Swiss-Prot record:
The modification Phosphoserine is found at residue 86. The gene is PGBD3. The keyword Membrane does not apply. Expressed in heart and oocytes, but not in granulosa cells (at protein level). It comes from the Eukaryota. One of its GO terms (molecular function) is sequence-specific DNA binding. Residues 38-47 have a biased composition (Acidic residues). Its main location: nucleus. Binds in vitro to PGBD3-related transposable elements, called MER85s; these non-autonomous 140 bp elements are characterized by the presence of PGBD3 terminal inverted repeats and the absence of internal transposase ORF. PGBD3 gene is located within ERCC6 intron 5. This is PiggyBac transposable element-derived protein 3. Keywords: DNA-binding, Nucleus, Phosphoprotein. One of its GO terms (cellular component) is nucleus. It comes from Homo sapiens.
Length: 593
């Protein structure tokens, strides 16, 4: 019976016979795999060689898969039999047991023929249906635009699950829609009126006291609502979805954001970081970003910053649709399908090198869309472009390009550094000139730029613009629970989207700060409930330094009797500077340290 070859014998064959082309070597676990101590590789963790393999691994039975061989057509016999006409030839497989097939579908690589030619294609038409102008036939206030997203259904969902969660803890919350809007107004106000501690909004000291907040909601009531805020039923959470506590709200806001998308043709897709400094399995660290620690959201947006679609990153995506294209490309395809379903049409998508691949461009083209994006070298195999090193030695503005038979063009352009861009909707021409500063000449010079680079620069920054808008007035009130940061981000996102619609459809738009202030004032003045007469609050704290300075402490008569700050008996006099009730006879003792 033919014997099974070991890993050591197979590697010897590969080293001595150059005619053998192997695509993979599959080995069995070594005999000491379950032993408490096993021999280890002597090489480094990265960049090791075949000479560093341990002896137990070299003597393990293995089989070799040659290029072009079909592993599924092998015989069930675990051994092998050489061919009669060439006994020295290595068979296509040496096997003892085939590994289980991978669950993930893999893309078949198709080699393309590239030639040096420009891409000539007409721009896509954009949306087929008309934009939702019927919602803006009359002038809408900032609050009315915001409530296109935070409508009665969304507010009732938050109120329902917050009351349900409080009830499960034995607390009668009794939250109403009007009270939640007042609560949300305080959250929005903290974005442009920031205090070190949120309780300082309700302090009576004149340096931090906020009349609008303290007159709208009691401090303890705000804390109770914040600690019980929920948007899902904890008894029915999806164990696979790590963001199931937020999923009902995210789904509803995605529907509304997609419903009111402005009539645009170009959409960008990128990541968005939400700051978070606690512990959670989905927390990310991205070096070089303005926000390095926090939750990562995938967002699709217009070039001006209206976010149409967003999903939180949670490692393995529960949605396995299009997973054969990879993590980044599958998300772009999910966004494109959601956009096309809500607004049928043909669009141009722009994204960075995390998402771009030739397979993704082909897939979007088959759906009637176009795309442009920077691309990594390993995502464009065997494109005969000039190397980065060669282009870097040439003058600024030099570029090289190739196009395949399916209408995908790849261009490598030398600017400050060499950048590679792939596109199915923009070519090299018309060339444009851009201004750059030359270190050598010590002046600005004109550099030629391909059209596809211009398209990428013009339409890529939508998500970054939204990030900048939100971060400028991000709510300073934060909770300790892991979901408080992404939950408040959802409210910030729809407020920013409402402002984008206001800019698009209003004849006299205001800036984001003024828009935010109008929403805050409306919510706190309309839905706030001032403290009832007779409610007793904390005693007012006075500045000790001014109390004992001995300057201008004048005792004046007041209209009604109040308690003396020194002897606590009723008096009709008060200190005008300290603003406390005070007998004339108690003034010296009160103002002496």
């Amino acid at each position: 019976m033919p014997r099974t070859l070991s890993l050591h014998e197979i590697t010897d064959l590969l080293e001595t016979d150059d005619s053998i082309e192997a695509s993979a070597i599959v080995i069995q676990p070594p005999e000491n795999a379950t032993a408490p101590v096993s021999d280890e590789e002597s090489g480094d963790e990265e960049g090791g060689t075949i000479n560093n393999l341990p002896g137990s691994l070299l003597h393990t039975a293995a089989y070799l898969i040659q290029d072009g061989s079909d592993a599924e057509s092998d015989s069930d016999d675990p051994s092998y039999a050489p061919k009669d006409d060439s006994p020295d030839e290595v068979p296509s497989t040496f096997t003892v047991q085939q590994p289980p097939p991978s669950r993930r579908r893999k893309m078949t690589k198709i080699l393309c023929k590239w030639k040096k030619a420009d891409l000539t294609v007409q721009p896509v038409a954009g949306r087929v249906t008309a934009p939702p102008n019927d919602f803006f036939t009359v002038m809408r206030t900032p609050t009315e635009i915001l409530e296109l997203f935070l409508d009665d259904e969304v507010i009732e969902l938050i109120v329902k699950y917050s009351n349900l969660y409080a009830c499960s803890k034995g607390v009668h919350l009794g939250l109403t829609s009007s009270e939640f809007k007042c609560f949300l107004g305080i959250i929005f106000l903290s974005g442009y009126v920031s205090v070190p501690r949120r309780r300082m909004f309700w302090e009576q000291r004149t340096d931090v006291h906020n009349v609008l907040v303290s007159a709208a909601m009691r401090r303890d009531r705000f804390e109770t609502i914040f600690s019980n805020l929920h948007v899902a039923d904890n008894a029915n959470l999806d164990p696979v979805d790590k963001f199931s506590k937020l999923r009902p709200l995210i789904s509803k806001l995605n529907e509304r954001c997609m419903k009111f998308v402005p009539n645009e043709t170009y959409f960008s897709f990128d990541e968005f970081m939400v700051p978070y400094f606690g512990r959670h399995g989905c927390k990310q660290f991205i070096r070089g970003k303005p926000i390095r620690f926090g939750y990562k959201f995938w967002c699709g947006a217009t070039c001006l910053g209206y976010i149409c679609w967003f999903q939180p990153y949670q490692g393995k995506n529960p949605n396995t649709k299009h997973e054969e294209y990879g993590v980044g490309a599958s998300l772009v395809l999910q966004f494109s399908e959601a956009l096309t379903e809500a607004h049928p049409g043909q669009y141009h998508f722009v994204f960075n090198n995390f998402f771009t691949s030739i397979a993704l461009l082909d897939k979007l083209s088959s759906m009637g869309h176009q795309a442009t994006g920077t691309v990594r070298k390993d995502h464009i195999d065997r494109v005969p472009l000039e190397s980065d090193v060669a282009l870097k030695k040439k003058e600024r503005g030099t570029f090289d390009y190739r196009i395949d038979g399916k209408g995908n063009i790849v261009c490598r352009w030398n600017d400050n550094s060499v950048v590679t861009v792939a596109s199915s909707g923009a070519g090299i021409h018309p060339l444009c000139l851009v201004s750059r500063y030359s270190q050598k000449l010590k002046k600005k010079i004109q550099v030629q730029q391909p059209n596809m680079i211009k398209v990428y620069n013009q339409f890529m920054g939508g998500v970054d613009r939204a990030d900048e808008n939100i971060d400028k007035y991000r709510a300073s009130i934060r909770g300790k629970k892991w979901y408080s940061s992404p939950l408040l981000f959802c409210f910030e996102l729809v407020l920013q989207n409402a402002w984008q619609l206001h800019k698009t459809y209003d004849e006299k738009p205001v800036d984001f700060l003024e828009f935010r202030r109008r929403v805050v004032c409306h919510y706190l003045e309309t839905h706030g409930h001032p403290p009832e007469p007779g409610q007793k609050g904390r005693p007012q704290k006075r500045n000790i330094d001014s109390r004992y300075d001995g300057i201008n402490h004048v005792i004046v008569k007041q209209g009604k009797q109040t308690r003396c700050a020194e002897c606590h008996k009723n008096t009709t006099f008060r200190c005008e500077k300290c603003d406390v009730a005070l007998h004339v006879k108690c003034s010296v003792e009160y103002h002496t340290e």
